[in-house]
């Protein structure tokens, strides 16, 4: 477990570093946009603009190298294509997560309802069979025992 803890700490550190790099790149592009808007056209301003552009290209290059490093813990992180599509569409990936969790919850509730309904049907049918055919009580109880969950999942809420 200690190896997993170390790997998790390394992954968290790499994620934090990558997040800082992305934030820095975004901030640089915002600054670049402001600089372009207010660009006076002087040779000094042109030189500063080129320096700023080169800094942005270098930051993007470092981020690209980091993200494609096979030794990095980040190479083992899979991001669902749907999340990437959400981001490309300008949507918040947290919305994807919330909608996904809600869909799973609805599906679980539906499945739980089906299981509960089938259990009631099984028990009702078993009662009717035993009432009409008392000699089948033992096989019916065996069937109920074999078709009942080991841990009482249906009673958990």
From Swiss-Prot:
Q: What InterPro entries does this protein map onto? A: Mediator_Med10
Q: Name one GO biological process term.
A: positive regulation of transcription by RNA polymerase II
Keywords, sorted A to Z: Activator, Nucleus, Transcription, Transcription regulation
Provide the protein's localization.
Nucleus
This entry carries the following GO cellular component terms, namely: core mediator complex; mediator complex; nucleus
Protein's UniProt keywords contain Nucleus: yes
Q: What else is known?
A: Present with 1472 molecules/cell in log phase SD medium.
Quaternary data: Component of the Mediator complex, which is composed of at least 21 subunits that form three structurally distinct submodules. The Mediator head module contains MED6, MED8, MED11, SRB4/MED17, SRB5/MED18, ROX3/MED19, SRB2/MED20 and SRB6/MED22, the middle module contains MED1, MED4, NUT1/MED5, MED7, CSE2/MED9, NUT2/MED10, SRB7/MED21 and SOH1/MED31, and the tail module contains MED2, PGD1/MED3, RGR1/MED14, GAL11/MED15 and SIN4/MED16. The head and the middle modules interact directly with RNA polymerase II, whereas the elongated tail module interacts with gene-specific regulatory proteins.
Similarity field: Belongs to the Mediator complex subunit 10 family.
The protein depicted here goes by the name Mediator of RNA polymerase II transcription subunit 10
- From which source organism is this entry? Saccharomyces cerevisiae (strain ATCC 204508 / S288c)
Q: Which gene encodes it?
A: NUT2
